[in-house]
Amino acid sequence: MPREDRATWKSNYFLKIIQLLNDYPKCFIVGADNVGSKQMQTIRLSLRGKAIVLMGKNTMMRKAIRGHLENNPALEKLLPHIRGNVGFVFTKEDLPEVRDMLLANKVPAAARAGAIAPCEVTVPAQNTGLGPEKTSFFQALGITTKISRGTIEILSDVQLIRPGDKVGASEATLLNMLNISPFSYGLIIQQVYDNGSVYSPEVLDITEDALHKRFLEGVRNIASVCLQIGYPTLASIPHSIINGYKRVLRVAVETDYSFPMADKVKAFLADPSRFAVAAAPSVAAAPAAVRLVPLLSRPRRSPRSLMRTWLRPVRLK
C-alpha cells in the first residue's frame, strides 16, 4: 500500500509540473539553501495570486521535463540548471515585480559555524558592552580593543569574514555575542526562463531607459562611421542631406548662383545687424537663426567667416 501511495504521488507530481510548464510561459529557477519550511510557507503566501512555487527532487523534475520535450523542445534548456537545492517559481506576471517580491521575503539569519558566507561581514567600531574577561577572545581573532568604562570597545572596523569563507566557531560566537545577524536567506534566482529563452537574472536589471540609451548610442556610432566612409544608411542619410544642403549654400554664397534660401543667407551677410535684430523676437520660429546669433556676436570675425562656420558639415563623434 505505501508503494502505491508513493507511485500515485509521483504520478501526480509529474502531472502537476507538466501542467505548470504548459500554463505558465515564464518561471524562475531558484536556489533554496538555508530556507526553512516556515519561511517557505511565508513566501508561498506572499506570492499567492502572482506566482506558484514548486519544489521537488532534481531527478523527478528532470524526468518530468524530459518526458515533455516532444511537446515543448525549448524546455531542454532548463535541464543543465537543475542541480543543487533548487525549485521553480512559475508566473504570468511581470518578472521584475515577482523578483522584488522574492527579495522582500529574505530574512536575516545569524552566522552558524561551518556555513559558507554569502557576503562580506564587517564588525563596526563600537562599545560591545562586554566585560574585560572577554578581551582574550577578541585578541585571538586579531581585533584591536581597549577597556572603556569597564567594557570592551572595538577601536576600528574589522573585516571578519570574506565572501565564500567558511564561518569558524569563534567568528560565529563573536557575532552572536554582538547580536549581529550578518546573513539573509531566501529563494535566490539562478536562471530565468521566458517563452523558450533562458538567461541570467542580471538581465532583469536592464530598464527600458537603459535599452533606449544603448540603442541611441548604437545609431549614433553607425551614423558617424557611415558619414566618414560615405556609405548611406537610415542613420546617416539625414546628416548627409543636411551636409549636402550646407555645401550647396556655401557654393551659392561664394558664387552668383541663387535660390530662395541662398538669397536669405546673402542678405544676412550683407547686413548682420539687421538679422540679429530680426531674430530676437522670433527665437522659437527660427532655430537656424538662433544658431547664428552667438556667432555673429563674437568679435574679430567677419560675417562671411561666421557663415562658413555655420555651413560646415556635421561630423558626429
UniProtKB/Swiss-Prot annotation:
It comes from the Eukaryota. Gene3D superfamilies: 3.30.70.1730, 3.90.105.20. One of its GO terms (cellular component) is cytosolic large ribosomal subunit. One of its GO terms (biological process) is cytoplasmic translation. GO terms for molecular function: large ribosomal subunit rRNA binding; structural constituent of ribosome. InterPro entries: Ribosomal_protein_uL10 (IPR050323), Ribosomal_uL10 (IPR001790), Ribosomal_uL10-like_insert (IPR040637), Ribosomal_uL10-like_insert_sf (IPR043164), Ribosomal_uL10-like_sf (IPR043141), uL10_eukaryotes (IPR030670). Keywords: Phosphoprotein, Ribonucleoprotein, Ribosomal protein. Phosphorylated. Pfam families: Ribosomal_60s (PF00428), Ribosomal_L10 (PF00466), RL10P_insert (PF17777). P0 forms a pentameric complex by interaction with dimers of P1 and P2. Ribosomal protein P0 is the functional equivalent of E.coli protein L10. Belongs to the universal ribosomal protein uL10 family. This is Large ribosomal subunit protein uL10. It comes from Ictalurus punctatus (Channel catfish). The gene is rplp0.
